[in-house]
Amino acid sequence: MKKFGKVVVKLRIPILVLSFLLLIPSVLGYFNTRVNYDILYYLPSDIDTMQGQDILLDDFGKGAYAMVVVDGMNKSNVSKLVKKVEGVDHVASVISYSGIVGDDVPSEILPDKFRSYFENEDSGATLFAIFFDDTTSSDDTMKAIQEVRDVTDNQCYIAGMSAVVTDTKTMAEKETPFYVLVAVVLVCIVLAIFMDSFLVPVFFMLSIGMAIVYNLGSNYFLGEVSYITKALAAVLQLGVTLDYSIFLWHSYKEAKEETPDDHQEAMAVAIGNTLTSVVGSSITTVAGFIALCFMSFTLGLDLGVVMAKGVVLGVIGCVTILPSFILTFDKALEKTMHREIMPNFDKPARWIVNHSWIFLIIFVLLLGPAIYGYNNTKVYYDLSDTLPEKLNCSQANKMLADNFDGTNSIYMILADSNLSAEDSNAMMNEVNDLDGISFALSIDSALGGEIPTEMLPDSLVSELKGDEYQIMMVST
């Protein structure tokens, strides 16, 4: 290991030059790596949800959908709004009140139940559905969501997963650099105070930052990464690999005490000692991240590969780039040395060792409450609830819930296209009786037998009924 250290010491300037040059392709790779904002994409392909999405695309030419709430607009203007939305690229179809019965049919002659699906007479809100020709998080769908907002001059509220994904993308792109910067500043402040040099944290951040950029840039070869991975990777890599840099610095100081007149020899020894200690530690860390790769929910694979790669690059940077920085700016580091503020923990350490049985008893006693807490902690699965209320999608979900019978989310059921009207109504009635369901409807149940299906436009029927399947909607 010491031989490797001597090579690094000898080639420190070329290493620094190369490390800066590698930032160029890494930055290009980072900006050209596609980010996936659809959590559903990472579900196994054989589950019903993903099979249903494939059927929607193959049989109906639809992937994503959104519910649009229009507040305080008369029917004529809503119809004009729908026409605008239909003209947006990648909007496959729009299902609205006017599209079903036309503008000339008085709403008073229609069943109250049917009208309630599209109108709230008390608040003046109107509801219609948009279907897109691509999947929930595709670039085309997100672009279409934004264009719908633009053509309607923000007069409508777009709810649904595609709107959530679009707003999540905007928010993540805006906030990720900010909290990474906050993490770096906080780490620098803590290290500058508790270490013996004000300058060394800067070189820690430079070497770790380069490794992070290499990691994020090399994601280009993975094709795409999830927005969760992109948001977490930098901060996680910083936290996981920072200890390696601290270990190298302390090892270098100890080696300098033995060879005070030869700092290059001291660094070679420090690199060797760091490699010996850090490799074992990093392997266990890498193994932990690789374990995520075996999840059937493949977000684990996405995060595991990126973080395992980040740890390896962090170790390499710690024993190549960081030593090169330290030796190159050794005199500047010496000038910024100060007395360590961190107190000596020798006495507490000896006391803990001498009274270890006390801590054993304490932790055994804490095990029971810990297990109870783990088993009784409530887990939420709705990511949209974690988003700020000021986002467009959050406001839209609230409008949807306030105006249409507590509706929060709308889902689709794909049923047999040849299902009779009687069986369809019976199925929807059973679904409506389930806890947490606001409403469930199919074409037959929406009409309620009072309006013949034949009265509906063929274009509408074909949107909801195919050769093998028909679309039913369920709201929770």
Explain the meaning of each model-derived region.
Residues 27, 39, 57, 111-115, ...:
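Generic intrinsically disordered, low-complexity segments enriched for polar/acidic and small residues
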Residues 35-38, 102-104:
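Surface-exposed, low-hydrophobicity interaction/linker segments
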Residues 1-35, 41, 136-381:
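Membrane-embedded transmembrane helical bundles of large multi-pass transporters/channels
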Residues 45-162, 378, 384-476:
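Structured non-transmembrane domains adjacent to transmembrane bundles in polytopic membrane proteins
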